[in-house]
Curated annotation (Swiss-Prot):
Name of this chain's protein: Pantothenate kinase
Matches recorded under HAMAP family: Pantothen_kinase_1
GO terms for MF: ATP binding; pantothenate kinase activity
Gene Ontology terms: cellular component: cytoplasm
Amino-acid positions noted as binding ATP in the UniProt annotation, renumbered to this chain: G91, S92, V93, A94, V95, G96, K97, S98
Enzyme class: transferase
Organism: Streptococcus pyogenes serotype M1
Cited Pfam families: PRK
Length: 306
């Protein structure tokens, strides 16, 4: 184990799955398919072996958060205020963050039927393309400087204080923020925050997004595997874009397969790999839990912070 993981306990898949009594998966195969991202791969067995124990662990942290909040209120002689439980999920582009986030949202909704479980992606806090063009940052989209971190931190602060909060909405079809559209959040019991940058903050070194998280997950994999997944996903997106001339990716949909692969590989190496190595992976040890994926997308190792 490298020094980076010295503060983590390594748990094999075989050991991890014993931490939850065998039970039904709480969702159907059709539901699982509907929340699985393009070219991701997850099975009902993965839900039972990996995600049901994870739901149990999140419940442990939730109870601890409530107990601490209760004790603080007694100490300060203030009324007890239960705050939203915020879960941050990070990792590279194409590593499977969205699938994990949607699955956790569904499972938490099933295990906490009286709770409001919401999901927000940090894509909505990217600056609009026009602003990025004006600032000469369009080719840096996804890098730390392309996010409105002040707006994102204000959003999390409002959520944590039980206030109604609004998040911009991003569309991958148009590759931009949707004008005049907001997603509203009214004091949810759980909020899942998903994005490549959830452990970063380049604006203010004294405050990190992760300061607002009650639990956090990093989805990890070898960069060569992620590159393969990224290219496979890009090709799948192009197939879908052929049916929609208004889709941002329609301009690439007519490329010969070899050229499309070369284009995707170049984007991976010049943008996504650089972003991963310089800004995303270095934040990995800020997570409470690291889920490591093998080449077939299956989670084979789990690292839990000691």
């Amino acid at each position: 184990m490298s020094n980076e993981f010295i503060n983590f306990e390594k748990i094999s898949r075989e050991s991890w799955k014993t931490l939850h009594q065998k039970a039904k998966a709480l969702l159907t195969q059709e539901e699982l398919k509907s929340i699985t991202s393009l070219n991701d791969n997850i099975s009902i067995n993965d839900v039972i072996d990996i995600y049901l124990p994870l739901i149990n662990l999140i419940q442990v942290y939730k109870i601890a958060q409530e107990n601490l909040s209760f004790s603080k209120s007694l100490f300060l002689k203030k009324d007890i205020q239960l705050r939203p439980f915020i879960i941050g999920i990070s990792g590279s582009v194409a590593v499977g963050k969205s699938t994990t986030s949607r699955l956790l949202q569904l499972l938490l909704s099933r295990t906490h039927p009286n709770s409001q479980v919401e999901l927000v992606t940090t894509d909505g806090f990217l600056y609009p393309n026009q602003f990025l063009i004006e600032q000469g940052l369009l080719n840096r989209k996804g890098f730390p400087e392309s996010y409105n971190m002040e707006l994102l931190l204000d959003f999390l602060d409002s959520i944590k204080n039980g206030q109604t909060a609004f998040a911009p909405v991003y569309s991958h079809d148009i590759y931009d923020i949707i004008p005049n559209q907001k997603q509203s959040f009214n004091n949810p019991d759980f909020l899942i925050v998903e994005g490549i940058n959830v452990f970063q903050n380049q604006q203010n070194n004294r405050l990190y997004m992760s300061d607002y998280f009650d639990f956090s997950i990093y989805i990890d994999a070898d960069s060569s595997h992620i590159e393969t997944w990224y290219i496979e996903r890009f090709l799948s997106i192009l197939k879908l874009a052929k049916r929609d001339p208004h889709n941002y990716y329609a301009q690439y949909a007519q490329l010969p397969r070899s050229e499309a692969i070369a284009f995707a590989r170049n984007v991976w190496k010049t943008v996504n790999l650089e972003n991963l190595e310089k800004f995303i992976e270095p934040t990995r040890n800020r997570a409470e839990l690291i889920l490591h994926k093998s080449a077939d997308h299956k989670i084979d190792e789990i690292y839990l912070k000691k």
